[in-house]
Amino acid sequence: MASLGAAAEPERSLFGKDGAEACESPEGRRSGRRKRTKIVPVWENKPCGSSRSLVRRIGSHLPLKPCTRACFEALPSPANLYLTDTPMVPTLADIKWIAADDDETYARVRSDTRPLKHKWRPSPLLVMHRNSSVPNLKMKEEKMFCLKKPGLSLNKSSDIQEELSILRSQIARIVAGDSVSSCLGSDSIPVNVDLEATLPDYGPSYQSTTSFVISDITEEDELDVSEYSSASLVDSTISLQRQLETNMSDDDEDSLCLSKSNSFADMMGILKDIHKMKLNRDWSNRNQCLHKEEDPVNLISEVLKQKFALCDPDNVKTND
């Protein structure tokens, strides 16, 4: 009985205040009457404190410390990557960038609901300069292309100058051929004969009393084009028509000498060369060549009027 009483003592301390509340009295057992007792927990009869609940009792023996919070660091700009000697600390942006890589499929999750590849554009915060030590080849290619541009432009300008020289020579041949064919008459030269074939046939058989010189002109001559007037054009046409009438009668005295310069500047040089053509004619002295340098505006007007007036010799006679 002593052992049973000792074992019942801790049970009484846990579930009740007194032994009478926890179990029946020995007198009741002897009399055969069972008496029900109400079991009251210890934590209901205790005041507020550390032993009020089982959770607080466990928490007092096993204290739970708060977990450490995640620290986010700002990413440095690409310009400051080489200025700092300390290594960069990896952040969540690195993980996002790795998950966005197409080759590294192991970093993806099944719940990844990222949009399509051609629509997805990573934000500047997610884009990491992982290969910052690798040189940027695109920038070098652009720099080399910019350095090659002047050389390409020079080559193009030289090609354009060659084409302009060919055009200049063709224009000079056309003007010279028209003047030769109109001066010698329609009976002496057929209409369908090539211009290049007519020049060597009729050129050396006459004395050189007229010369057309094509040369380069400076930029100062361009300003003279705006000063051209209609009155000078009319006067030049009348004087040319009178000279052409005497030219038709004296066929033995006519000749033509064409010379070209070797260097040509640009497209405006075509007009400059025509302006600078030197027309020297002195019908009073037949065997002498007197070179006259006239205004470029008057020269081009005279050459054009000579071209169109010589084509119609009948109109020249009627006008006089």
UniProtKB/Swiss-Prot annotation:
Answer whether the UniProt record assigns the keyword Mitochondrion to this protein: yes
Which residues fall in a compositionally biased region of kind Basic and acidic residues?
9-30
Major location (coarse): mitochondrion
Example GO CC term: the record gives: mitochondrial outer membrane
Query: Which superkingdom, per the lineage?
Result: Eukaryota
Enumerate the UniProt keywords alphabetically: Membrane, Mitochondrion, Mitochondrion outer membrane
Whether Glycoprotein counts among this entry's keywords is no
Where does the UniProt annotation locate this protein? Mitochondrion outer membrane
Region Disordered: list its residue ranges: 1-37
Matches recorded under Pfam families = Mito_fiss_reg (PF05308)
Membrane disposition: Peripheral membrane protein
Q: Name one GO biological process term.
A: mitochondrial fission
Give a short account of what the protein does.
Answer: Mitochondrial protein required for adaptation of miochondrial dynamics to metabolic changes. Regulates mitochondrial morphology at steady state and mediates AMPK-dependent stress-induced mitochondrial fragmentation via the control of OPA1 levels.
Similarity remark: Belongs to the MTFR1 family.
What is the protein name for this chain? Mitochondrial fission regulator 1-like-B
Its source organism is Xenopus laevis (African clawed frog)
Q: Which gene encodes it?
A: mtfr1l-b
